[in-house]
Each structure stands twice: as structure tokens, then as C-alpha cells.
């Protein structure tokens, strides 16, 4: 199989493909035939899950700011602001929730998963930080599977109810507001 050896203008690609960047995740993979997952993500996204990826993730913020909410080893939430033009390398296995506001774009690169390599999508209570729900997947289609996991959580009131404090997370996710 021959691969195309050609560059292209990424900003033009983003402009021509904006309609593909839809909530909740707003992601579009650029190349299907690579050993990397290279995708453009736009804002505003509508997600509150924390992704636990077995590989590092490279963030390059093209326009605006991205807020990567991370869970530290001590269990605390910490927000990393990735400003326009900045890069950020997120280490493997750090639970993180990338938040994008309107009219922002970024590039995220991570490696494709090996057969049998699993990763998690985790939801924590907004009130007490208790783990509410966890989905473990063999990731093969990042555009499809992340949306399915988010939809499954949002549409099920039982798993949106915290068993620790009783808080019920709303079905609809509002745009991120950095506090």
C-alpha cells in the first residue's frame, strides 16, 4: 500500500471541516492510515468524563485556550491551561478531562492502542469527587466510542446519581467555565 507523501495546510483543513467538529467531543481524526491518532478538536465541547489513556497525549493549541482538568496522584482536581500556541505533554494514565470553549481549535496526538490494551472513561461527582461510573474499552474508533460512552452516561439517571452524597449530575452538560 502506498501512502501519500504530501503536506497540507492544517488551518485550511480546519476551516473546511468545522462542521465535523460536533459535541460532545468535537473531534475529527486527520489520518486513518497512521500508527498515531492525530485529531483536531474544536470548541465548545460538552463532556465531563475523565479519560485514562495508556499512552501519553500531545496537545498543541492552535486557536484560543484549552483547559485540561486532571486528577492528581493525591486525588485532587487540577486544571492545566494550554494557551494559543502552547504545547502540553500529558503523561500516560493521568485521568484528564479536556474542556474547550467556543471558537477554539487544537491538535491532539496519541498512539493507537495495541490489541488487548484497555483504557477507561471515568465520571466523578461534581459535589464530592466520588467515582460514579467507569467504562473500560479496547479503543478502536476514538470518534465513535468516546461519544457512545458519554451518551450512555448522560442518558442514564441511575449512573448520574452519586452513591456517596446523592447529587444527581444533570443530563445536559454546559459549556466549561474556568473558575
UniProtKB/Swiss-Prot annotation:
Keyword Nucleotide-binding listed: no
Cofactor: binding details: Binds 2 Fe(2+) ions per subunit.
Biochemical pathway: Cofactor biosynthesis; NAD(+) biosynthesis; quinolinate from L-kynurenine: step 3/3
GO molecular function, one term: 3-hydroxyanthranilate 3,4-dioxygenase activity
EC code(s) of this entry: 1.13.11.6
Binding site for O2: 47
Disulfide bonds, paired cysteine numbers: none
Organism of origin: Bacillus cereus (strain 03BB102)
Protein name in the entry: 3-hydroxyanthranilate 3,4-dioxygenase
Ligand binding (Fe cation 2): 125, 128, 162, 165
Pfam families the UniProt entry points to: 3-HAO
Binding residues for Fe cation 1: 51, 57, 96
Residues that bind substrate: 57, 100, 110
UniProt superkingdom: Bacteria
Family: Belongs to the 3-HAO family.
Cofactor(s) needed by this chain: Fe(2+)
Function: Catalyzes the oxidative ring opening of 3-hydroxyanthranilate to 2-amino-3-carboxymuconate semialdehyde, which spontaneously cyclizes to quinolinate.
Catalysed transformations (reactions): 3-hydroxyanthranilate + O2 = (2Z,4Z)-2-amino-3-carboxymuconate 6-semialdehyde
CDD domains, alphabetized: cupin_HAO
Gene Ontology cellular component annotations, sorted alphabetically: cytoplasm
Keyword annotations of the record: Dioxygenase, Iron, Metal-binding, Oxidoreductase, Pyridine nucleotide biosynthesis
Biological processes, Gene Ontology terms: anthranilate metabolic process; L-tryptophan catabolic process; NAD biosynthetic process; quinolinate biosynthetic process
Amino acid at each position: 500500500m502506498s501512502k501519500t507523501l504530501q503536506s497540507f495546510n492544517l488551518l485550511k483543513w480546519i476551516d473546511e471541516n468545522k462542521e465535523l467538529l460536533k459535541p460532545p467531543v468535537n473531534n475529527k481524526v486527520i489520518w486513518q492510515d497512521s500508527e498515531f491518532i492525530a485529531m483536531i478538536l474544536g470548541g465548545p465541547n460538552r463532556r465531563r468524563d475523565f479519560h485514562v489513556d495508556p499512552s501519553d497525549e500531545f496537545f498543541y493549541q492552535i486557536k484560543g485556550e484549552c483547559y485540561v482538568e486532571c486528577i492528581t496522584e493525591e486525588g485532587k482536581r487540577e486544571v492545566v491551561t494550554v494557551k494559543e500556541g502552547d504545547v502540553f505533554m500529558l503523561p500516560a494514565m493521568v485521568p484528564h478531562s479536556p474542556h474547550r470553549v467556543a471558537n477554539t481549535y487544537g491538535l491532539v496526538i496519541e498512539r493507537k492502542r495495541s490489541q488487548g490494551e484497555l483504557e477507561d472513561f471515568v465520571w466523578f461527582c461534581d459535589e464530592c469527587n466520588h467515582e460514579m461510573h467507569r467504562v473500560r474499552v479496547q479503543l478502536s474508533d476514538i470518534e465513535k466510542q468516546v461519544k457512545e460512552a458519554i451518551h450512555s452516561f448522560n442518558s442514564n439517571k441511575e449512573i448520574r446519581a452519586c452513591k456517596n452524597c446523592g447529587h444527581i449530575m444533570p443530563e445536559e452538560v454546559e459549556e466549561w467555565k474556568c473558575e
